[in-house]
Amino acid sequence: MFTPNGMAFSPDGRTMYLSDSHPKSQLIWAFDYDITTGAPSNQRVFVDMNPLPGRPDGATVDTDGCYWICANDAGLIHRFTPQGKLDCSHEVPVKKPSMCSFGGADMKTLYITSIRPAHIDLSDQPLAGGVFALRLNAQGMTETPFKPN
């Protein structure tokens, strides 16, 4: 793994997802996850993003167990089913979405951050570096805080 990114967990906490954003990889991995010990096992390819536009970046999971990931360099957010099938894609007004997370009172708003590279011509992407909200029918989950022993 070159550039780990896109860590998220299934609703039951028993599957951990991790993407590799490096252009030579562009894979999203799934692991069995032991919620008692915190040990991942059974690494397998969940999605190969090479045939899709964009590189995998930040991600989250909804209550249906679907994995949402920013497609950096493509201006898209992809949603994959728990079986790894592309369910839908949503456009955002920038080329480099970087992270997504559900929020709002009903957890049905997907908030998306973006990157504003130093060399960018803002006349091409005036909203680069902005944060966007996408209203969805899908519902997110609150994140489980880390509790060190």
Regions found by a protein language model. Name each.
Residues H78-S89, K95-K96, G104, L110, ...:
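Flexible "stalk/tail and boundary" regions
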